[in-house]
């Protein structure tokens, strides 16, 4: 009753992801699959789509290391039944598949953490997402708002447990900002995403991994290379906090 004004759920739909019911069969780490069948674009119709699946506490960007078998528009998953013919898998909110949004880790002692959910990704029940359902479609501002201490405090008041539900997110009070403030916040949010992407580019388990920091950083010794990388990562993370 305290939240009488408009809520987040009026502008964005908190969507629960799919449950394959057999991840050993349908889900892989991206480095385990034939790279020629790894989808990089919506139009390519390749077998393995990137799969937002939650993961450890991590803000802005990352935890992109799993892929799911979506060959023939997910035919195998959609027709996965038990011996009696009863449906085992649950393909939920398919209308939002492959759209950009905001994904989050819903369970953890540190609370929820929110990250960019790139277009061309699918999402798991453990990596549920928020998608625009109105004329307001600024995912950058939404991401910044949800990663604030204010949003964290409100979620903790609504549900003081280690699990954040779709209903909790929908109830958060939300006001569309004035354009000038929205632009500033969105730019800082996008900057944070770029900084986290730069860090992920040196993490071998992330899909945007490019090269080892031991190759890129030009220290004269192994110790110097490691120290240069740690300085780079610390600088990026410090800027994220300042933003």
Go through each PLM region and give its residues.
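Hydrophobic/aromatic-rich, well-ordered segments within soluble, folded domains that form packed cores
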Residues: 49-51
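S-adenosyl-L-methionine
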Residues: 3-11, 16-44, 53-58, 65, ...
């Amino acid at each position: 009753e305290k939240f009488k004004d408009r809520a987040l759920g009026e502008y964005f739909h908190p969507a629960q992801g799919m449950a394959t019911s057999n991840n050993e069969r349908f889900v892989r780490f991206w480095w385990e699959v034939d790279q020629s069948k790894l989808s990089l674009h919506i139009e390519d119709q390749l077998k393995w789509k990137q799969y937002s699946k939650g993961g450890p506490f991590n803000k802005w960007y990352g935890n992109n290391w799993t892929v799911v078998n979506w060959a023939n528009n997910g035919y195998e998953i959609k027709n996965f039944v038990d011996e009696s013919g009863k449906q085992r898998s649950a393909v939920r909110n398919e209308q939002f598949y492959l759209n950009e949004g905001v994904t989050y880790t819903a369970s953890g002692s540190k609370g929820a953490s929110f990250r960019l959910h790139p277009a061309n990704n699918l999402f798991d029940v453990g990596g549920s997402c928020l998608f625009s359902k109105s004329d307001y479609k600024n995912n950058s501002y939404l991401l910044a708002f949800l990663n604030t201490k204010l949003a964290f405090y409100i979620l903790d008041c609504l549900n003081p447990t280690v699990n954040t539900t779709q209903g909790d997110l929908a109830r958060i009070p939300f006001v569309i900002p004035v354009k000038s403030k929205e632009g500033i916040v969105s730019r800082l949010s996008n900057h944070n995403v770029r900084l986290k992407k730069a860090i992920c580019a040196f993490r071998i388990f992330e899909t945007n991994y490019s090269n080892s920091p031991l190759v890129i950083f030009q220290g004269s010794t192994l110790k110097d290379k490691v120290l240069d990388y740690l300085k780079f990562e610390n600088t990026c993370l410090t800027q994220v906090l300042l933003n």
